[in-house]
Curated annotation (Swiss-Prot):
Keywords: ATP-binding, DNA damage, DNA recombination, DNA-binding, Nucleotide-binding
Pfam families, sorted: HHH_5, Rad51
Domain of life: Archaea
GO process annotations (BP): DNA recombination; DNA repair
Gene Ontology molecular function, alphabetical: ATP binding; ATP hydrolysis activity; ATP-dependent DNA damage sensor activity; damaged DNA binding
Family: Belongs to the eukaryotic RecA-like protein family.
Name used for this protein in its record: DNA repair and recombination protein RadA
Function summary: Involved in DNA repair and in homologous recombination. Binds and assemble on single-stranded DNA to form a nucleoprotein filament. Hydrolyzes ATP in a ssDNA-dependent manner and promotes DNA strand exchange between homologous DNA molecules.
Binding-site residues for ATP, renumbered to this chain: G107, E108, F109, G110, S111, G112, K113, T114
Length: 325
């Protein structure tokens, strides 16, 4: 199939094509799923022109129409599964972490969210026969928790597990980390992630995993009090949809960690609740609640999924990484 260039679209001349590329809209698919207002503001073109360009892109990319369930099922075969490194965890997730979806992990401090994120950053680089996706990683670090030393320990762990001597430095070269200093910066980094994914698209290591650790930390710190709640949720909602679009366009896994709060008025059940409210609850495809157990063991509970039953998996967090308990 011949790749359609931006210049081939109706209403797009060389100057407009350059504006679109400069704004981060480098593919037909990216334009097809944008809104007219978003395209107009980003590329500095009129909103009516933006609407015409989007319609042309949708026709070209065959996006936006109805399709039968069997075609959806056929397309679902392109969805990849990333192994967590733990058999019980993988089985609960139907084979691993899915591409083209958001997997949210929430739990108290020290529950192992960042540890699992680090492990996935290693595992995704492995070939499919070893549970990986043969791709690189983009990590948006909001809490300064990325540790290359921990990656090196985990690479040693998988070297011992598979009986193959892997080089930690090679793994680190394929992890692209950016520190987000506030919520606006965090949102902008998703645009940068799209650009990087396009650059690496046809290389040996295309981007197959986006990690945001933690998704809600900056939003929680910057928007204080009920008076700012509506603004915070609107901004978070837009951010989540940008992240989800990244996963769709790159056929990549999207893993976000989330902080929790305690509800002191909860007399029955677990008082621990994730930050982000209903907006995050509706947008995340899979929700995982991680809590501490005895020693190095952790319990991972699948709280929400569109196609899998609720379940629990026992994992262990050791020097070698995440594994069977």
């Amino acid at each position: 199939m011949t790749e359609v260039l931006l210049e081939d679209l109706d209403h797009v001349g060389p100057a407009t094509a350059q504006k679109l590329k400069d704004a981060g809209f480098t593919t037909i698919e990216a334009i097809a799923v944008a809104s007219p207002a978003e395209l107009a503001n980003s590329a500095e073109i009129g909103e009516s022109t933006a609407a015409k360009i989007i319609n042309a892109a949708r026709q070209s990319a065959d996006i936006g129409g109805f399709e039968t369930g069997d075609l959806v099922l056929e397309r679902r075969k392109l969805v990849g599964k990333l192994s967590t490194g733990c058999t019980e965890f993988d089985e609960m997730m139907g084979g691993g972490i899915e591409t083209q979806s958001i997997t949210e992990m929430y739990g108290e401090f020290g529950s192992g969210k960042t540890q699992i994120a680090h492990q996935l950053a290693v595992n995704v680089q492995l070939p499919p026969e070893q549970g990986g996706l043969g791709g690189s990683v983009i990590m948006i670090d909001t809490e300064n928790t990325f540790r290359p030393e921990r990656i090196a320990q985990m690479v040693k762990g998988i070297s011992d597990k598979h009986g193959i001597e892997y080089d930690p430095e090679e793994f680190l070269k394929n992890i692209h980390v950016a520190r987000a200093f506030n919520s606006n910066h965090q949102i902008l980094l998703v645009d940068s992630a799209n650009e990087l994914a396009n650059e690496l698209k046809n290389t040996e290591m295309p981007v197959k995993l986006l990690i945001v650790d933690s998704l809600t930390a900056h939003f929680r710190a910057e928007y204080i009090g009920r008076g700012t709640l509506a603004d915070r949720q609107q901004k978070l909602n837009k951010h989540l949809h940008e992240i989800l679009r990244f996963g769709d366009l790159s056929n990549a896994c999207v893993v976000v960690t989330n902080q929790v709060m305690s509800k002191p008025d909860a007399f029955f059940g677990d008082p621990t609740k994730p930050i982000g409210g209903h907006i995050l609850g509706h947008t995340a495809t899979f929700r995982l609640y991680i809590r501490k157990s005895k020693g190095e063991k952790r319990i991972v509970k699948l709280v929400d999924s569109p196609n899998l039953p609720d379940g629990e998996a026992l994992i262990s967090v050791t020097t070698d990484g995440i594994g069977d308990a």
